[in-house]
């Protein structure tokens, strides 16, 4: 029993709203869900909060590729995410989005408090700019060689190989991840968060025990290197929140993403009159706040986030808990091997509680990678859950229903029950400290004891003897009571199984009732609770995951979609007069959905052309550009005016159209030949 009720807010890192959830992601949500369910089982007030991380350039570009508005895309992805989580029995108290009114208000509030406190600095910087896409490149959209360890193909903000953080301008041989072009430097004004001003506070917070030792050690290295001011600005075009006092400037996604924890909780408070936002987030809050994250985002959660909260007058989290990555069969998740498994692919083939248990059995409080060995997975689930746990009930419940009117006997010898109850505090401590693997080992050791008791007593033999009926009744009742205790211990890990067992035993499984006397209690007829994992199901998952990759790796080529036309003679081609033209003016055409009106300078002569490129270009983006036109096309009278030629463009249409642009040095009027 919980000695006193705690107020707890727990979060998982926000999944990014540009793609599906996979089994690597699921480790964190399963870990957090188990911990939150345990706190609730112990009688504490615990709120598990999450949201989709819905801002940033990747989402903007993905939406463009799909010819969707970003808002439409993130709503669709959020629906898919929530269904995957629900089917994995992840029990959020609230799942929201960072693209919300609550988050916008809180992000603005925190920014303005930091600005007014003198923690926001403004300066002009030189930033990498994609000359082909006419956009500044976020850190993650520049790739190159790490300046520290020389690992190739690293992102512009940190190195996956050595963990170093740096500016994208520090990369060796940088390339735009959007177009592949070599970026150029361009000046822009940005706002910076003064992280070094919080160094003393962060050092003290690190020493307070709020972080795992591995995290604290890593922070020590970062302190030695010296903290840097943090760029919190992104230039348009960008999908996110505009900075209140800076039109055309947007908050970097990593500023408003962690604020999404607060935004989601604020949304929950708005739905419930019994919750007070300030009780959890005010500076003097006595509630507990915990963040579960992956080891790849430690820097943001252990430095920027607590410093932002401190500077804006909010409380800091009690602890930040990091976990490692998921490997499959001892190697990095691989699409080519079929081990990059989406949550939905798994759910289509296997019970989600199998994975919940397997992850729990291998999780500890350390930041270690966890290997999902698929053969071991099948063996462990079949041995522990089917062979030990469920088998305990399946071997004894039938006798209670058929021979003893479905009622449990009072057990004369309570020594086994006392042994099981004596482990409650140790198991609770393992859950509390996130040593789930140790908890599972304790529980399965008890299951072994219970199964040995049943095997030795052999109730299937006792029921055959007239004078052994009471003994058989007691053995089966004892076994089912031990089964009840085991499933109660496992309830945070296996909530659906626990629900089914509650229906079978016709009682609620609670930690406070572990020692409850069940003599005379009536149970329902036993129904199968779990099936064995068959390797054919695992093979189907691998096949489906590999098949998905093959489809992705072999799209139809442009030539498949648009075959080359029939041959023409050179004389036919020579009739075309292709010329370089400068777009002197571009403007919208009233009442025309697809056309822009272009004035094309041929170096002494101007031609007017109506071009069907409105879906891909704004007029202001075209003016001054060089392009290629068919100069000797017969004029065509249109209802908007006379069109005196044609500009050349490539692409299937809509947003995917690109006008041809000659290399530097070409001049208006030059013939293309």
UniProtKB/Swiss-Prot annotation:
Record has Nucleotide-binding as a keyword: yes
Function (record text): Is required not only for elongation of protein synthesis but also for the initiation of all mRNA translation through initiator tRNA(fMet) aminoacylation.
Classification via PANTHER family: METHIONINE--TRNA LIGASE, METHIONINE--TRNA LIGASE, CYTOPLASMIC
Residue numbers binding ATP: 335
Protein name: Methionine--tRNA ligase
Keyword Manganese: no
Cofactor note: Binds 1 zinc ion per subunit.
Location within or outside the cell: Cytoplasm
Cofactor: Zn(2+)
Family: Belongs to the class-I aminoacyl-tRNA synthetase family. MetG type 1 subfamily.
UniProt GO MF annotations: ATP binding; metal ion binding; methionine-tRNA ligase activity; tRNA binding
Main location: cytoplasm
Protein's gene: metG
